[in-house]
Amino acid sequence: MSDLKAAALRALKLMDLTTLNDDDTDEKVIALCKNAKTAVGNTAAVCIYPRFIPAAKKQLREQGTPEVRIATVTNFPHGNDDIEIAVAETKAAVAYGADEVDVVFPYRALIAGNADVGFELVKQCKAACGDILLKVIIETGELKTEALIKQASELSIKAGADFIKTSTGKVPVNATPEAAEIMLTVIKDMDVAKTVGFKPAGGVRTAEDAQAFLAMADRILGGDWADNMHYRFGASSLLANLLHTLGEGEEAAQGGY
């Protein structure tokens, strides 16, 4: 198997196959769940709005892939600084049956100089999650600077994040190699690689993109670190490209998350 094919297979099994669109329906989410089951393996998770969790859970069970996890989003995509609302949404997501919650860090508050609200929001959302995985979206494309990306990553980890995630996919700049390098280095420098994972989201569209992101993780944190409890790709259009690279199916037109 070529290096690119090996990376494509690895990336497929690390995908949070995502649909977070305003026009999502039960039918679209069911189709997404069907796509999570492929001839070469299943994606790690599907990522959907909370109201679609029951439909996804039923479909994943019926198609014989109950191990595909269900991730959802809260405080999304705006990243407002109302802790009470973020916690209420997170509790509701847990009640719906989410296996994982991706919450948006109040990044605009941090840009304005308020670090405390972000720490407290993540801490309280993690308390609401209990054992359920909490991924914190820091919105690197809006934070922009290395100092702010580093600070948001550190605050999230100190507050209890299980993963730090680059982006919502709803702003002009999403996952970049530069942001990934900063965030992975924070995980290394804080010595939390055993307990904290990383998720680039938005903008990872090809097997070559995924290969480059994985090579960076291997370089910074070691070749066996990026398993499906420490590394995810948040993507939709990536799947068709990975399957095409692996000789499965036709490559769809590129677009989306």
UniProtKB/Swiss-Prot annotation:
Nucleotidyltransferase keyword on record: no
Catalytic activity reported: 2-deoxy-D-ribose 5-phosphate = D-glyceraldehyde 3-phosphate + acetaldehyde
Transmembrane segment boundaries: none
Top-level division of the source organism's lineage: Bacteria
Top-tier EC class: lyase
Compartments, as annotated in UniProt: Cytoplasm
GO-annotated biological processes: 2-deoxyribose 1-phosphate catabolic process; carbohydrate catabolic process; deoxyribonucleotide catabolic process
SMART domains: DeoC
S-S bridge residues: none
Pathway(s) annotated for this protein in UniProt: Carbohydrate degradation; 2-deoxy-D-ribose 1-phosphate degradation; D-glyceraldehyde 3-phosphate and acetaldehyde from 2-deoxy-alpha-D-ribose 1-phosphate: step 2/2
GO cellular component entries: cytoplasm
Keywords: Cytoplasm, Lyase, Schiff base
Active site feature: 102, 165, 199
Enzyme Commission number, as recorded: 4.1.2.4
GO MF, one annotated term: deoxyribose-phosphate aldolase activity
Record-stated family: Belongs to the DeoC/FbaB aldolase family. DeoC type 2 subfamily.
Function: Catalyzes a reversible aldol reaction between acetaldehyde and D-glyceraldehyde 3-phosphate to generate 2-deoxy-D-ribose 5-phosphate.
Protein name: Deoxyribose-phosphate aldolase
Phylogenetic placement of the source organism: Bacteria, Pseudomonadati, Pseudomonadota, Gammaproteobacteria, Vibrionales
